[in-house]
Amino acid sequence: MAVLPDKEKLLRNFLRCANWEEKYLYIIELGQRLPELRDEGRSPQNSIQGCQSQVWIVMRQNAQGIIELQGDSDAAIVKGLIAVVFILYDQMMPQDIVNFDVRPWFEKMALTQHLTPSRSQGLEAMIRAIRAKAAALS
């Protein structure tokens, strides 16, 4: 994974933002830190349905059984949301991802209240897809 903060630092940084404009800029910055997804990652099987923007998420399991995620979007804010989700699932095994509830983190960040309905639905679609892929590996 790129140089992204851990869960706790993400939350601290997010809460330090003075207003939602700063928070959106921070989310976009996180998306810019994601490594570039190569063309082969932008395949139909990695495409996430239910997002208005184009979203691709690639999931691999490393030799230690830990899930490694890569992703991209054609929308800057959505790419940032991908980074937020990846931070929350960082260093997890498939069963950990299946069992982990991201909603309390989103509530602490007041994230879903400030997203448009279509972005909230897209975020949910990303989480469902990651959890489904993780369930298939566990």
Curated annotation (Swiss-Prot):
Active-site residues per Swiss-Prot or TrEMBL entry: C51 (cysteine persulfide intermediate)
Pathway(s) served: Cofactor biosynthesis; iron-sulfur cluster biosynthesis
Cellular component GO terms, alphabetical: cytoplasm
Protein keywords: Cytoplasm
Top-level taxonomic group: Bacteria
Annotated localization: Cytoplasm
A single BP term in Gene Ontology: iron-sulfur cluster assembly
Pfam families the record matches: SufE (PF02657)
Main location: cytoplasm
Subunit structure: Homodimer. Interacts with SufS.
Family the entry assigns: Belongs to the SufE family.
Functional description taken from the UniProt entry: Participates in cysteine desulfuration mediated by SufS. Cysteine desulfuration mobilizes sulfur from L-cysteine to yield L-alanine and constitutes an essential step in sulfur metabolism for biosynthesis of a variety of sulfur-containing biomolecules. Functions as a sulfur acceptor for SufS, by mediating the direct transfer of the sulfur atom from the S-sulfanylcysteine of SufS, an intermediate product of cysteine desulfuration process.
Protein name listed in UniProt: Cysteine desulfuration protein SufE
Source organism of this protein record: Shigella dysenteriae serotype 1 (strain Sd197)
Name of the gene: sufE
